[in-house]
């Protein structure tokens, strides 16, 4: 999680304005709104990345742009857009309505499902790739059952034995976790990867030695792995020919299942 608040998680249709932002209906129980920021593809949209940020176990406080959790994902979104935008890859970033997972309410998952509905309305049939950090990684895993989702990247995800693996069935999955993460459990991420590998289309797990939860150390590795994985999946689905960083194949060979960097 992105704040020191830990527990095992329970597992409107509006047009986009000129700023690329779009407001969702508030999550049930409060009036706060989720916001989507869109970096559009050049030309026809052939695929969409949905970027999901972290948060807290319980909080009804609204998420603001100044909060570190959504701000942390901006460089990832921009790098993906720089690398894939000209090839038809759009990048949508979701700012959740509230900061907490909130037990059975699963507030971020509600927001993510709303965002996926907006994407599919505008781009029916295109492949969708989910990229999430911390609580956003949990959200990505749970939202992956959407029929247009083809791949999931979960960075330092907040997973537990109760996290269902059914959502990633038939999906390509990359999980990355640091060895000195004191906020979420690398052991639980690895355990989930092993469980989910039985049904996922592919499962790759990367351990980053000396990296913590907030991706401050080895940032280029975090970004390179996420960008390379998404672009590789995008190219495989669409034959778009987006340029994959040369270093990606060295970091994570296609045949690799578990890698330590």
Region locations from a protein language model:
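A conserved short beta-strand
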Residues: 148-159
């Amino acid at each position: 999680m992105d704040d020191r608040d830990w527990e095992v998680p329970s597992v409107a249709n509006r047009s986009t304005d000129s700023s690329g932002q779009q407001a969702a209906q508030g999550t049930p129980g409060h009036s706060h709104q989720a916001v989507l920021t869109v970096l559009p593809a050049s030309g026809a949209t052939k695929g969409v990345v949905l970027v999901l940020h972290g948060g807290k176990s319980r909080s009804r406080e609204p998420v603001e742009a100044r909060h570190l959790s959504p701000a942390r994902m901006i460089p990832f979104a921009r790098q993906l857009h720089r690398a894939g935008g000209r090839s038809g890859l759009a990048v949508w970033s979701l700012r959740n309505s509230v900061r907490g997972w909130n037990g059975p309410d699963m507030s971020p998952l509600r927001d993510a499902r709303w965002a996926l509905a907006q994407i599919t309305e505008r781009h029916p049939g295109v492949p969708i790739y989910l990229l999430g950090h911390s609580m956003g990684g949990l959200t990505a895993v749970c939202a992956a059952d959407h029929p247009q989702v083809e791949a999931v990247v979960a960075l330092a995800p907040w997973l537990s034995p109760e996290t269902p693996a059914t959502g990633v069935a038939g999906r390509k999955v990359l999980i990355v976790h640091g060895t000195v993460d004191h906020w979420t459990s690398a052991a639980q991420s690895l355990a989930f990867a092993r469980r989910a590998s039985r049904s996922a289309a592919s499962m790759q797990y990367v351990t980053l030695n000396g990296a913590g939860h907030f991706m401050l150390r080895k940032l280029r590795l975090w970004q390179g792995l996420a960008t390379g994985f998404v672009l590789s999946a995008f190219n495989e689905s669409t034959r778009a020919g987006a340029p994959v960083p040369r270093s990606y194949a060295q970091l994570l060979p296609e045949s690799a299942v578990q890698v330590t960097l």
